[in-house]
Amino acid sequence: MNLKTDLPIEVFKTDRRKTVCIKIVDGGVHVIVPKRLSDARVKDLILKRTSWIKQKLRIQSETVLPKPKEYVSGESFTYLGKNYKLKLIPNGDGEVKMKGKYLTLGYPKILSETDRQSFVKESLVGWYKGHALKRLTEKSNRYEKILRVTPRSISLKNYKSRWGSCSNSGEINFNWKIIIAPHHIVDYVVVHELCHMLEHNHSPKYWRHVQSVIPDYKMDRQWLKVNGMGLFV
């Protein structure tokens, strides 16, 4: 399709979509549209959203990526919105413990620096996932009663660009990294997915369900847009 634009746009037509979706991905733009939509209609939609697309591309280009973790003693790690200092202890087996303002982690002393970093990262990720499943299940149980829904299952995923999902059969998956965020953000994500059991879309009716439980949900959505890239271990 010849769009006659200097914007880095790729158009994808699929039978799986009923509406138009525009995504900013790695400095480019993916426009995903229903297969039945004419090229002329697609061009018109892109033209109308040109200002929005340029704004999003500019914001992405100005975004500073978080500094990669080094997995060394004294480094800060966040859990449920609070920062903890990592304290590495030689002659350990990878068990992670929360002690006051510290996350202590024992590692085998014989490991090389590279192997130690990998060992520490894997141990921390395992700890975060274990706590994520526990906390997300607890929060889901709480909000299920309020919304009067019963998920078929609660599981964790390692999503790259989403915080959760809800299948038509009621299977809910959460991105385990959401447990890094403050409590109120985790609550929003849990309610967001549970409300999809009432409305499997993002219609005004769906958002009314969300707002009935999380009145300030728009602030939580904005928080995730601004801070989501920093939620990693």
Regions found by a protein language model. Name each.
Residues 193:
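Walker B catalytic acidic pair
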